[in-house]
Amino acid sequence: MFQISNIVVLVSKLIVKSRMLFYKLISSSETFSLFVITSGTAKFKRGFSGYYTNVLLSRIGKINSEIYYKKVCKLVGIFENQAIKDSYSWKYYSNIGILWHSTGDISKSLKSWYKYLESKEFYILEKGLDKFNIRIINPYPLASTIGNVGHLDGFLKLVELGVISKQKLIMPLPENSAIKFCNEHFVHNYLSNYIEIIKVKELPTVIRKKIEPLTQFLCGPLRLQGRIYPYNHTALSNASKLWELENRKPLFELNTEDLLFGREILARLGLPKDAWYVCLHIRDDSFKGSESFRDSKLHSYKIAIESIASRGGWIIRMGIKATPVEPDYNFPNFIDYANSEFRNSRMDVFLASQCIFFLGTSSGLYTLALTFGRPILLTNYAPMSSAHLKSTDYILPRLVKKRGHKTASPLNVILTAPYSLICWPGMEQYLGVEMIENSPEDIAAAVEEMFRSLEGKLSNHELESYDHIRKITERYETLPGGYGDSMICRIPAFFTKKYS
């Protein structure tokens, strides 16, 4: 027999599916969709506005660029009119910010995010919600993508630094919810040290509406010491910079139980005792589908893998449902943990927290290593506007090749808007460029530079190159919406010299 709790979960799922099906039917007609956004209840208009924004985003690169831009302008106009009428106006400004971003118009996007935060703060003060002195952390972003761990890590650091006012952080977890975090172990055993996770019954609509403005949008704008940072990644870069200036330790440290657990599994995976390893995570289309500007191929990392192995290191491949290693690939000291029986969220935390460094791509699993303060080298990276690692970490960006050109554009192009903003499938086509995958040789050279950094053997030329790139990113505003902010992490010196 079904328990009441099972029935509640089933009904909740059916309601969500029914609503999404209804939205899908409405959105099949553009005229009807725009009519619906201006009609009906305020709550329905807000919900459908967000859905239809994603519908339009899914068409970028698939329709003529001029037509797409006109559609964005039309939708933005409608959203702005609705924002004037709705006390929850920030809901519309977030959609407007996303839409302008998709066109590469960062100036208009930043203005929208600025309005988002101002209107939300005004509402909180007007309704006296600030007296509760709490911030709600929505659990769902941590279920949708592991990369949001990085946003939360930066936010928590800003709170600990006192740059953001210290408030009680609460994550309400609905009872009987079907929610499944991308890493259950990290949330319940580490994140819970900073955020109170409370089980709650289904909240009445009137209460949900009251506390919704207190919910922290992890990817949204932040106010730091009185200044609004409309672009979240710029604020997070500041978090890393300030954290290092105060010489603080990572927020998280692996506990003894997990350390013993991880060592036992390592032995069963075949790693020799006391051997060191590098975590390798390469985004492909096996888990969340294809995104050409972020996907990479395992064989491009062969030289880098051989380089690590030649030093006596091991390579542990991370991920979920990763593309199986082809039979003719004979990688030395290589463990395909991603496709092993031992893969689980607890072991993911152990591996990311104990690696000598994390070799990743434009996919969020590296943020686990970030929270534990491990060295990071990201390859085939985009967008550069989201670079918010530590000052000793490395990013090897994808270059862009403009339509009709035979060779890639210089490095400074990918550091400049709109190309530094490419973060949706289709933006390449819209902007008339192709993102170029890093060559195996460049990936291997970046790994060698990381080793020199870890061993304290960097040359003066390399150190000067890092400073030069930081000045370049400040000049080009690679991190948008800041106050003379530069990217604090490194681009490998050989790459800067080769492609400038």
What are these regions (language model features)?
Residues F2-S500:
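N-terminal targeting/anchoring "stem" of glycan-biosynthesis enzymes
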